[in-house]
Structures are given as C-alpha cells and as structure tokens.
C-alpha cells in the first residue's frame, strides 16, 4: 500500500515530519526546552496550549523507517 502524506503530515528535509506547527516538532535524539512568555490574560495561553495539543493529536504522525510517516493517517 502506498503512503504519500500531504503537507501537514509529510516527511521533510532530514526526515523530519512536516507538522501544522513546525515549532512544536519533536527532534529525535535531542532534548528540547520550550520557554513560553505570556503577555496578557492567562486564559489565552491555556486556550493556545489546548489548540496546539489538539492539533498534534489530530495528526499523530512521526517519521518511521525509510523516512515514511508512521502511522500514515492522512
């Protein structure tokens, strides 16, 4: 079965899966620390985090063997 994921769930350069939010992309073999500075109302930050987590859960893809999406659900 051929698996050709689209722009929001496709392996990009260096076998990094393309995500809707590339800044939230996990790097394999590296530790990433994210610092969030919120200016304004605290509830806006909570809403953004929920939206970002939902976006990641909806795609749920990562680069597998031979630079192919695993699982391919696009």
From Swiss-Prot:
InterPro entries: Metalthion_15p. GO terms for molecular function: metal ion binding. It comes from the Eukaryota. Possibly relevant to mugineic acid-family (MAS) phytosiderophore production in iron-deficient barley roots. May have a function at the regulatory region of MAS synthetic genes or Fe(3+)-MAS transporter gene by conjugating with Fe(2+) like FUR protein. Pfam families: Metallothio_2. Keywords: Metal-binding, Metal-thiolate cluster. This is Metallothionein-like protein 1. Belongs to the metallothionein superfamily. Type 15 family.
């Amino acid at each position: 079965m051929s698996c050709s994921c689209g722009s929001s769930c496709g392996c990009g350069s260096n076998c990094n899966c393309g995500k809707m939010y590339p800044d939230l992309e996990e790097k394999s073999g590296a530790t990433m620390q994210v610092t969030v500075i919120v200016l304004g109302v605290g509830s806006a930050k909570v809403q953004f985090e929920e939206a970002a987590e939902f976006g990641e859960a909806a795609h749920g893809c990562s680069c597998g063997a031979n630079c192919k999406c695993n699982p391919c659900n696009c």
